[in-house]
From Swiss-Prot:
Span of domain EF-hand: 556-591, 631-666
Matching InterPro entries: DM10_dom, EF-hand-dom_pair, EFHC1/EFHC2/EFHB
This protein's name: EF-hand domain-containing family member C2
Subcellular location: Cytoplasm, Cytoskeleton, Cilium axoneme
Domain called DM10: residue spans: 75-182, 226-366, 428-535
UniProt entry tagged with the keyword Cell membrane: no
Keywords, alphabetical: Cell projection, Cytoplasm, Cytoskeleton, Repeat
Cellular component GO terms held in the UniProt record: axonemal microtubule
UniProt function note: Microtubule inner protein (MIP) part of the dynein-decorated doublet microtubules (DMTs) in cilia axoneme, which is required for motile cilia beating.
C-alpha cells in the first residue's frame, strides 16, 4: 500500500545534488525549429523518460593485437563472396528468368561493398560492375544503418537496393576471417543453372560445320623464333651490265615471320653511294618479277555467294575449294642453302657462306653437317710500295721519314715498352760493357784500352777511354752516346739504315764504329750473366748451342781431347787450368768464338768460396755495437751458462741465435749468421766464450774498419784486368755432358 502524498511522507529527490542545469533540447536547423537533444539528459543530468544510459566502457574485454584504426589495420583486405540473383525476363518465349552470377566484395577498411558480374561469352547484356563501391544501407525499417561484416554468411540472402543476392560460397581468406571472428558458417550452396545458357550450349555442341575453318595462326611461330635471324653471305655478279661490278651482300632471314632483308657491303673508295638497305624486309617470291594484281585478287580467304547488304555484319560463305585462288610461293628456310642461287626480283644471288648460329640451326633442324663455303672474293691487289724520298743528310733518318708521312711533321716515336723494360732498376743498369782494343798498325794505339758500353734501353753505344799513366794519350770520352750504323751502307738512300744491336756485340767480335775498327776482348761479369740469362736473344751465350757444336767434332778429335785432358791432369783430379782449356777449344774445328769459350768455361768452372776475413767481420760487429751502446755482455754470459747444461762451454747454433735475439743484439741476420759459423767447432757447436769475447768492444777492441777495406760495387769500372773469375775447369763434368756418359780418361 502506497503512502499518501502528505508532508513528511514524500522523498526529496534533490537532496545531495549539486547540479541543476538544464540541457538545450530545442534549436533551429536550417531555419526550422526542431528537437535536437534526443541524446541529452534532463535537469541535473538525470535521464528523461524512455532514455537508456550508454555504457561508458565496452562490455567486451580488450583483445590482443594492434590498436591501429580499421582503415590501417584492414588495408587491402577484402572479403569475396560468390553469389547470384534471378532476373525476370518478360515477353520472351525462350526464357522466363535469367540466373546471373556475380562477386560481392566487402572492403574491411571502411565497410564498403562492391558487386561485380564476370563477363560471359555471348551474354548479350552489359556486364561488369553492377553496384559501385560504397556503403550500402540496410533495408527498411533499419535503413539508417549500413551493412557490416556480421551481416554476411554462406547460404544466406542479402538485399541490396530491392535485389536479392544469394551468397553461395566464399574464398579461403574470407572463410578463415569469419571463423576467427566467431561466425558459424553455413554449408556452401550450389548455383542453379541458367536455362537459356544451357540451351545455347546444347545447340553449339550439336552444330557440326561441313569443314573446319582454315586457321591462320602465326603466334606460335612468332613466340618460338622471335629475335632469331639467319645470316647468309651472298654474291651478285653484276659485271655484265654497264658500269656494273661484283656485289657483296648480306641476307637476313627472320624466322619469326619468314621475311628477308638484304644489305650491301660497300667497300671503301668504290665510288658507290651507301644505301640503308639493298632489299627491304618482306617475303621474297620465288618467281619474280610477278604481274601486278587487281585489288581483291589476293586475299587470305575466298568469299562466295554474297547476299544481303555488303558491309559489317553482312552474311557470307567461305569457299572451301578455293576455286580461282592465286597461290604465290615464297622462299623458306629450306630453300636457303650454301651454293643455292635465289631470285631476288630478277637478280641471281649466290649464297656463299653463313654464320655460326645459322649452321647450328640447320644442323639441329635438317641434320646438315657439312657447310662448305664458296670463295667469291677476289684476292686484293698488292699494295704498292710507298716511295720514300732519299735521305737528305739533315737531321736523323727517323726524323726525315716522319716528315714524309704527313703534311704535319711529327717527331719520331721511341719504343716506350722497351724503354720501360730495359731501364735501370736499382743496381741493375741494363748496360753491356765490353773491353775493346783498337785494330791498327800504330804501336801507340795498339796499347790503348776502351770501354764500349751498349745501352739496352735504346740500342745506343758509347765509347770511353780510361786514362793510363805514361801512355801519352789523354783519356776520356771517345765516342758520344748514340746509335751507330753498320759499315758498308749508302748514306743517301730511301731505306732505313741498319744499326748495331746487342746481338752484334760479344767477346771476340770486330766492330767498325764510325770508320774506327775495334775488337772486343773482355766484358764485365754483369754482361756475361745477362747474356747467359737471355740465351734466346744471344746465341753466343747459349750453352745448349755451344755444347751441340762441341758434340759435332769427329771421333779423332774426341780422342785428341781425351789425350789432352790425360796429359794435362796426370793426377786424375778431374780439373785443369782455364788457359789450357781455352787452347784446346781454340784448336778444334768447331769455330768457337772467344765469347763461347768463356761462356763454356764459366759454366764448367770450379767455384771456390771466397775466404771471409774474421777480423773484418768482428770490426764491423764491434762498430755496430759501439754505435748502439750495447754493453749487456755479462748478462749474455750468464744466459749462455744457464743454457749450457753439460758445462762444456758450447751451445748449438740455434740456441745461441735465440739468446742473441732475446737480448736484441743490434746485428744484421747475415752478419750474425756468419759470425756464428766462424766460431763453430767440429761438432757444429758455438764456443760462446770466444764469441762473446770477440764482439766485446769494451774489453777486447779491434782496429776500426777502414774505408778501403769495405767491399763496394765498382760503378766506374775502367777495364783493368781483375783477378780472373774462372781459374779451373771441371773437364770431367764437361765430358759427361758432351759424350753422354762419364768417360774414363786413363783407359783411353
Amino acid at each position: 500500500m502506497a503512502l499518501p502524498m502528505l508532508p513528511g511522507n514524500s522523498v526529496n529527490r534533490n537532496l545531495g545534488k549539486d547540479k541543476f542545469h538544464k540541457s538545450q533540447h530545442f534549436d533551429y536547423s536550417n531555419g526550422v525549429a526542431m528537437m535536437v537533444g534526443t541524446e541529452k539528459p534532463g535537469i541535473g543530468g538525470d535521464l528523461l523518460l524512455g532514455q537508456s544510459a550508454r555504457a561508458k566502457y565496452s562490455r567486451f574485454p580488450k583483445g590482443e593485437g594492434s590498436g591501429a584504426p580499421a582503415w590501417l589495420a584492414f588495408d587491402k583486405q577484402v572479403l569475396c563472396f560468390d553469389a547470384y540473383f534471378n532476373e525476370a525476363v518478360p515477353q520472351r518465349r525462350e526464357e522466363k528468368y535469367r540466373v546471373r552470377k556475380c562477386k560481392i566484395y566487402f572492403y574491411l577498411e571502411d565497410d564498403t561493398i562492391q558487386v561485380v558480374e564476370p563477363e560471359f561469352k555471348n551474354s548479350g547484356i552489359p556486364q561488369g560492375t553492377l553496384i559501385r563501391r560504397h556503403r550500402i544501407p540496410l533495408p527498411a525499417p533499419k535503413d539508417d544503418c549500413f551493412y557490416n561484416v556480421h551481416h554476411f554468411n554462406i547460404n544466406q540472402e542479402v538485399l541490396f537496393y530491392s535485389r536479392n543476392f544469394m551468397i553461395t560460397d566464399c574464398d579461403p581468406f574470407t572463410r578463415n576471417f569469419l571463423v576467427k571472428m566467431g561466425v558459424r558458417l553455413n554449408p556452401p550452396a550450389s548455383t542453379p543453372a541458367d536455362p537459356y545458357t544451357t540451351l545455347r550450349q546444347e545447340l553449339e555442341e550439336n552444330m557440326k560445320p561441313l569443314r573446319p575453318y582454315e586457321r591462320l595462326d602465326t603466334l606460335k611461330q612468332f613466340l618460338e623464333h622471335d629475335r632469331q635471324v639467319l645470316r647468309f653471305y651472298c654474291y651478285w655478279d653484276d659485271s655484265e651490265s654497264m658500269f656494273g661490278d661484283p656485289r657483296e651482300l648480306i641476307l637476313h632471314y627472320f624466322l619469326a615471320d619468314d621475311t628477308m632483308e638484304m644489305y650491301e657491303v660497300v667497300p671503301p673508295n668504290s665510288g658507290r653511294d651507301t644505301v640503308p638497305k639493298f632489299l627491304h624486309r618482306g617475303k621474297l617470291p620465288k618467281h619474280a618479277p610477278i604481274p601486278k594484281r587487281q585489288p581483291g585478287e589476293i586475299t587470305d580467304r575466298t568469299v562466295l555467294n554474297v547476299f544481303g547488304p555488303v558491309g559489317q555484319g553482312g552474311p557470307y560463305i567461305l569457299d572451301s575449294l578455293k576455286t580461282g585462288a592465286l597461290e604465290e610461293e615464297f622462299y623458306k628456310d629450306s630453300d636457303l642453302t650454301i651454293g643455292a642461287v635465289i631470285n631476288v626480283w630478277g637478280r641471281r644471288v649466290l649464297i656463299c657462306d653463313c654464320d655460326y648460329f645459322t649452321k647450328e640451326y640447320y644442323r639441329s633442324k635438317y641434320g646438315i653437317e657439312d657447310f662448305p663455303s664458296i670463295s667469291y672474293k677476289a684476292s686484293p691487289p698488292p699494295k704498292p710500295a710507298k716511295q720514300v724520298p732519299p735521305y737528305t743528310g739533315f737531321g736523323s733518318e727517323e726524323d726525315s721519314l716522319c716528315s714524309c708521312q704527313g703534311l704535319l711533321p711529327k717527331p719520331p716515336q721511341k719504343d716506350f715498352k722497351k724503354l720501360m723494360e730495359k731501364d735501370r732498376r736499382g743496381l741493375v743498369s741494363n748496360v753491356l760493357r765490353f773491353v775493346g782494343k783498337m785494330l791498327t798498325d800504330s804501336p801507340v794505339d795498339k796499347e790503348r784500352v776502351f770501354i764500349i758500353c751498349f745501352y739496352l734501353t735504346d740500342d745506343t753505344i758509347a765509347v770511353f777511354e780510361p786514362p793510363q799513366r805514361n801512355s801519352g794519350v789523354i783519356g776520356g770520352k771517345f765516342l758520344e752516346r748514340g746509335r751507330v750504323k753498320k759499315p758498308g751502307q749508302e748514306l743517301f738512300k730511301s731505306e732505313m739504315s741498319e744499326y748495331f744491336t746487342a746481338q752484334d756485340l760479344y767477346v771476340g767480335a770486330h766492330l767498325l764504329l764510325n770508320s774506327q775498327p775495334f775488337q772486343l776482348v773482355d766484358a764485365d761479369d754483369f754482361t756475361f750473366s745477362y747474356m747467359e740469362q737471355h740465351a734466346d736473344e744471344f746465341p753466343k751465350a747459349n750453352i745448349g748451342t755451344i755444347i751441340s757444336k762441341v758434340k759435332s767434332i769427329s771421333e779423332e778429335q774426341q780422342k785428341t781431347v781425351k789425350q789432352f785432358f790425360t796429359m794435362s791432369d796426370p793426377s786424375s783430379t778431374g780439373s785443369l787450368p782455364y788457359e789450357s782449356f781455352r787452347t784446346l777449344l781454340a784448336d778444334l774445328d768447331v769455330e768457337l768464338s772467344e765469347h763461347e769459350i768463356m761462356t763454356l768455361g764459366r759454366v764448367y768452372s770450379v767455384r771456390q768460396q771466397p775466404e771471409v776475413n774474421v777480423g773484418l767481420m768482428l770490426a764491423v760487429a764491434q762498430d755496430h755495437l759501439k754505435k748502439k751502446n750495447f754493453e749487456k755482455f755479462s748478462e749474455m754470459i750468464q744466459a749462455f751458462t744457464h743454457e749450457d747444461r753439460d758445462r762444456c762451454g758450447q751451445l748449438s747454433s740455434k740456441e745461441a741465435r735465440i739468446i742473441c735475439k732475446a737480448f736484441r743484439l743490434p746485428l744484421s741476420d747475415d752478419l750474425l749468421r756468419a759470425l756464428l759459423e766462424k766460431f763453430a767447432g767440429e761438432s757444429e757447436k758455438i764456443d760462446y766464450h770466444a764469441f762473446l769475447s770477440g764482439i766485446n768492444w769494451r774489453e777486447n777492441p779491434v782496429p776500426a774498419v777502414l774505408p778501403e777495406d769495405t767491399v763496394k760495387f765498382d760503378a766506374d769500372w775502367r777495364g783493368e784486368a781483375p783477378e780472373p773469375a774462372v781459374k779451373t775447369i771441371n773437364y770431367s763434368l764437361l765430358l759427361e755432358d758432351v759424350f753422354g756418359s762419364a768417360t774414363n780418361i786413363n783407359d783411353s
